[in-house]
Amino acid sequence: MNAPAEQADDVCTLPLVRRMAALLDRDPASFADGDLLPRGWHVALFNPPTRQSELRADGAAHLGVTLPDLGLPRLMMGGRRIEFVSDIPIGARVRRTSRAGAVTHKSGRSGRFALVDVEHRINLHDNATPVVIETNSYILREADGGQPAAESMTAPAAIPPADAIQILVPDETMLFRYSAITDNPHRIHYDLAYAQTEGYPTLVVNGTVPTMFLLEMFRAHVGGEPAGWRGRNLAPILCGAPLTLTLGREGDEWTMRAHGPRGEVALEARAWQ
């Protein structure tokens, strides 16, 4: 797939930053114009104003690039890689250039699916040098039969010791606020009846939500900001189910995980400075 690059412009506004701070239980008043945006919070920017008539059947909006219609209506993010080259000042005008990579078709136990990477390069409006380079990996799947997913029958897994541990219970208000901040209309995050048609027993937590809290753990326990992040979503994270967030050092990197209620790893990431 050799689709042309697509560009979008935005402004890193103070009210938007303060709403993200409130979601993460930080003091919104501690942020002011000219401060540096905490790394990772750029996810609140560049949410394309997709026309209602152009939303996918699952509610998913434009991803920053135009993807071909592959006949695969279910969308999920498989992972993301981020290089933080520099920082975005609050109040700055920013531009994002997005490109889609090749589409890889595969098949497995769940049927036919496709993988596609979308690369985003963000720069300040008066400087062509990127401040953030991000690659998001998406999985497109066939429609589900509509039967609720069965609970895992695997034995509970022990959560290994870590330098920092935090319990997070994503609830409906957290999902609503995150979707509002990021203008995310993907229905599995707020429409229970629709989520069940995709085989989920309840609402699905956007994988970026625990990512944001893991980045907060990194700042609190490591000190300073990360230079890079590499994460994989390994299992659905369900609304109301407790997550155990862990952080531990491994060599020059820090490993972070979100463990589900049975100890299973739902999200795994590495960050470095």
Where are the regions a protein language model picked out?
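Hydrophobic, proline/glycine-rich low-complexity stretches
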Residues: 1-93
